[in-house]
């Protein structure tokens, strides 16, 4: 229980730090999700007008997040991240998704979910690159 609290707190602090360093959108606010599902929506919205490949990968990632297919989501997000055309709002959506995924994976890994443990290891590798 304490580990979950610490993980959630850490994820919140990291997200706040990232967002404070990134600036804000036109209306002065930055969208932050409080769940994996919200992050999936954020990703879809941010890439609605992107190039077809990025939009497709954002859709794949969002759907995979909703279905709990976390490795698939991470691969799609990693593909998007590598594109040089990612704008500010899209970058925020990517970070929002990764932070919410990390929190979800930690919760599931603590409960012994082997797929979550494998996905968390993948997330750590992605974050190193």
Predicted regions and their residues:
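C-terminal motif of bacterial Sec signal peptides marking the signal peptidase cleavage site
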Residues: 17-21
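Post-signal-peptide N-terminal segment of Sec-exported extracytoplasmic proteins
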Residues: 38-79
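Short, charge-rich amphipathic alpha-helical segments embedded
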Residues: 75-103
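Bacterial N-terminal signal peptides that target proteins for export
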Residues: 1-10
